Amino acid sequence: MVDRPVIQYVVEEGLASGADEVVIVNSRDKKSIEKHFSPDTELVATLRARGKDAYADEVERVGNLNVSYVYQDEPLGLGHAIHCAAEKTADEPFFVLLGDVIVPDNNICPRMLEVSRAHGGASVIAVLPVPDEQVHRFGIIDGAPVEGENGVWKVNSLVEKPALEDAPSNLSVFGRYLLSARVMELLADAKPTVGGEIQLTDALDAVLAEEEMYAVVISDEDGFDTGTVETWLDTNNKLYARKNG
């Protein structure tokens, strides 16, 4: 994405949020991701010998980011992938950052953490307003604005890809979550549902019956989608303009 892999944006966002460690849920055959975040003394030495110290510094920095890995041996859904990292979260709240969206200014997770702390450690999700014609493509929240808290909603329920006439709002789940430890417990007992997969949405619905959940409304200037060819190209253009404007 312009000058770095999408996964690097996501890792750097996670570390900038104050997380102690970024855990990548990987498949065992995707060694290129692990290589990217591993020290490469040979490449660093070659770059320095050629007078490319700035590039060498960047390779060195990326190779020393605090990243670890767990493996999802079967593609059993997002909920299953998250639970693969259960031992890493150690019964504590945790962020989930999906790799098909990026937040170049690293400004969403700190806001989510602030809202969670203001509401007793509640789970918080990021949501993005979408046009009516796109509502059916996303998970949509049902809820209401919190009085006195600009851009914060209390979530009542989540509706997965509703028809426009059934949508309770136009606020789509964006791919940034700050989740309580209870969500991980629920994922441990979750059964496959749609498509034979373990869905995160099911665990979020279950936790809503026990705990409060809030949403932080973001704008399309805060986060960018890379999940389709069209959005990938659009995001590249926007980021290039930002860097060279």
Name what the model sees in each region.
Residues 151-154, 168-245:
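Conserved alpha/beta core of the MobA/IspD/sugar-nucleotide pyrophosphorylase nucleotidyltransferase superfamily
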